[in-house]
Amino acid sequence: MGTCATACPTEAIHYALPNPEDTQKFIERTLANYEQAGGLDPIVLICSSRHEIYNVMALKALPDNVIPIVVEELPSVGIDTWFAALVNGATQVLFAASRFMPQTIIRVLNSEVGIAQELLDQLGIAKETIDILYLESLREGAPTLCTESFDLALGDLQGNKRQRLFTALDALSASRIPVENIVELPANAPYGTVSCENKDCTLCMSCVAVCPTRALHTDGQSPSLKFVEQDCIQCGLCEKACPEKVLTLTPRMNWVKEERQKAVVIHEEKAAECIRCHKPFAPQSMIDMLQNKLRGHSHFSDEAAINRIAMCEDCRVIDMFESMAADPMSQLKY
């Protein structure tokens, strides 16, 4: 039904036909043609092709500046497309829904629209600018219609789902002053930051290994953990993978584009140097942790074995063979 495509923050799952970019281009060109024809204050009404009769009834009750965009399923159009419409001339985006739709669709639609409305509110824009229009409510009266123009026409937005969304959000925030630069979002929002309790982090890189978007990454040159906020989808995999439990997720929106896109170091250490060749090879905290945990183990009963942990991969092998050559009988102890 398309709900998974709307809920997916990375576009790993997306509607294939039409794909999101084609839908956005269609809406952008429809709005451009409407403006060229002299139309004012266009409102986009996203309708499902499964409910044609109800769509016609809704349009009869709405003013002429409401433009229907028919899709196979309402949830097949994601939050990036909604905001793309706003930065291409639309004054409002509505969904022609019914309370008799499957609860799965209603739940996902409410969740995603709720996040969009929170973002709008942070920019001082009326929450109703993106809203669900339940057709049954038309019997009670006309819905709240927004006619304030944002005076934007960005055209086709480039990149993946998140890049297109943030392009639209940055354009809106450039014309509006956000309430605050950093504002908390609901717990289900796929935008936010990750913080690290540095004193307990060993830089094992388990979080980097599981991060699906490379929001958490390392440069491979030094023992450091880097983070790009715009790429974080708040999936929680890093939090679950961390053996020391030092990572904390915070859903929020950082409206400062440069800060959000910048790779920041959330933890770094001086590299431990091999005690034989002095080559940097691992975080010092990890070496200390391994030595403390393995001290007393039967395979690390002597100081020589403990010291090998503080050696690089090459020197460790050399030291083992030197020890075996000096005292071959010691191997019989194991």
Identify the role of each PLM range.
Residues 39-48, 92-98:
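Short hydrophobic beta-strand segments
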Residues 41-53, 105-106, 118-219, 231, ...:
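Ferredoxin-type iron-sulfur electron-transfer modules and their immediate structural context
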Residues 49-58, 73-74, 99-107:
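Short acidic, S/G/P-rich loop/turn micro-motifs used as interaction or catalytic elements
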Residues 58-67:
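Short helix-loop-beta junction
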Residues 65-66, 72, 88-91, 97, ...:
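Long, compositionally biased charged/polar accessory segments in the mid-to-C-terminal portions
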Residues 77-78:
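Short, compositionally biased pre-sequence/patch detector
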Residues 81-131:
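Cofactor-cradling patches in redox/metallo enzymes
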